[in-house]
A protein has these predicted regions:
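Alpha-helical transmembrane segments and their immediate juxtamembrane cytosolic regions
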Residues: 1-292
Length: 292
């Protein structure tokens, strides 16, 4: 996903000068229209080259690696449209984050608005998604599309599964609430829940006290270090034959992340990877200014 983040950050550059209202409108439109555009592009591509041919050669099916630079067209298609996190639809979350970051988050009225708006969006999308899942024929239609048992499919629709990418040519995909499916309903569910949690945390901050929140504040300052660090831990765990999905491992990662966040907060320093990125960004900016 780091490749996707890199592309998202580049696309965000023209938006940095916009105000919260404009960014919010863009994010809202992107949440709805992004998945529709992905649906249209992928459906058209499958119609042009054939369904099976598209599945075999239309995406990487793995996280991008250095060798994929030798296939720039396929790499770009995977990052923007056909991969697990297509920027064409997932970019909405970055723009939403930019919009929220422009708001005066220390005001309780703003925090309450974020909580209320997020909860409303989440509830509305949840009602729509639940109605679609309960509608007669939905599970059978999905099972026929991806070639799975209806009982397994019913569970898959509630938990998420990469094979749902095979559903994209069917417009029903746009209304599925399945996590990480990239549908319109799933996008609004995720965005609404994220806003609701953020608003609730902002409202709870004065009640909890700054000292108790320092591990969380620090963790928020070193997201890249924590993300890459947890990938390294998961790779080491997987190499030992242990189960990466073990609940004890999740608890350990949470504790380690909070400990690292507290250390970053107390030291007042960036994380190691954040420091590297800051130096690279500063060097690139100075070179760009110097070359004018």
């Amino acid at each position: 996903i780091l490749c996707h983040y890199a592309l998202l950050f580049l696309l965000a550059l023209p938006l940095l000068g916009l105000r919260a209202r404009a960014l919010g409108l863009i994010a809202g439109a992107w949440l709805v229209l992004g998945p529709v555009l992905v649906f249209a592009v992928v459906a058209a591509a499958q119609a042009a080259v054939g369904r099976q041919e598209f599945f075999v050669g239309g995406r990487l099916w793995l996280s991008p690696g250095p060798a994929d630079l030798l296939r720039p067209g396929l790499l770009l298609a995977d990052l923007t449209v056909t991969g697990y996190y297509p920027v064409l639809s997932w970019g909405a979350f970055l723009v939403l984050g930019l919009a929220l970051g422009r708001l005066p988050l220390d005001r309780r009225r703003v925090a309450a608005g974020i909580l209320g708006g997020g909860a409303t969006a989440w509830a509305a999308a949840g009602v729509v998604g639940a109605a679609v899942l309960r509608a007669p024929g939905t599970v059978g239609r999905v099972a026929a599309a991806i070639g799975t048992d209806p009982v397994e499919t019913a569970l898959t629709l509630r938990t998420g599964e990469p094979r749902l990418a095979l559903l994209i040519p069917d417009p029903l995909w746009l209304a599925l609430p399945t996590p990480h499916s990239g549908s319109v309903v799933a996008a609004v569910l995720a965005a609404g829940w994220a806003c609701a949690v953020l608003g609730a945390c902002l409202l709870a901050r004065p009640l909890v006290g700054h000292a108790a929140l320092r591990p969380l504040v620090g963790a928020g300052r070193i997201p890249l270090t924590l993300y890459v660090g947890h990938l390294v831990v998961l790779a080491l765990v997987d190499a030992t034959g242990l189960d990466p999905a073990d609940g004890a491992l999740l608890a350990a990662l949470v504790v380690l992340s909070l400990a690292a966040g507290l250390a970053a907060e107390l030291s007042g320093r960036r994380g190691p990877l954040e420091a590297v990125m800051a130096r690279l960004s500063r060097a690139g900016g100075e070179r760009a200014v110097g070359g004018r």
